[in-house]
A protein has these predicted regions:
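Hydrophobic h-region of N-terminal signal peptides that target proteins for export
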Residues: 9-17
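Acidic, Ser/Thr/Pro
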Residues: 18-125
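Positively charged n-region of N-terminal signal peptides that target proteins for export
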Residues: 1-4
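Short helix-onset patch at the extreme N-terminus, typifying the N->h transition
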Residues: 6-8, 61
Length: 125
């Protein structure tokens, strides 16, 4: 019993510092704030349809590696990939129906704070 409690004490903080967050749109917008522990990541993921446009912006307290990616089988495609940036903005035009993830990796020895904002653009069909 003691061993199980000790393992939980060790495992829970590790899992809590590598976050995967589902995008929950509210009136076409999504905002998320998180602390990213050293050598951990934050990933914000959601389903987009081909042609959907999502404006994105983020501000961090320190530089992180950033990408937007999606998986097709074992292959990973990166519509956006930047190294060592504390803030950036842009837009994603979804090339196909897929789950897309915005991801930040903290390669430093210090925690960093991150604020992410996504906004769905209205697309004329």
């Amino acid at each position: 019993m003691r061993r199980a409690a000790l393992l939980l004490t060790i495992a829970l903080p590790i899992a809590a510092n590598a976050d995967i967050v589902d995008i929950k749109w509210a009136d076409g917008a999504f905002t998320h704030r998180a602390s990213i522990a050293p050598k951990k990541f934050l990933e914000v993921c959601g389903k987009q349809k081909m042609g959907d446009v999502v404006g994105w912006t983020f501000n961090g307290s320190a530089a992180a590696d950033f990408n937007i990616h999606y998986h097709i089988g074992k292959d990973v495609s990166y519509p956006e990939n930047r190294k060592g940036v504390a803030s950036a903005e842009g837009s994603l035009v979804a090339p196909l129906d897929q789950d897309y993830c915005w991801m930040w990796t903290n390669r430093s020895a210090q925690s960093l704070e991150m604020e992410v904002r996504l906004k769905q653009a209205k697309v004329e069909k």
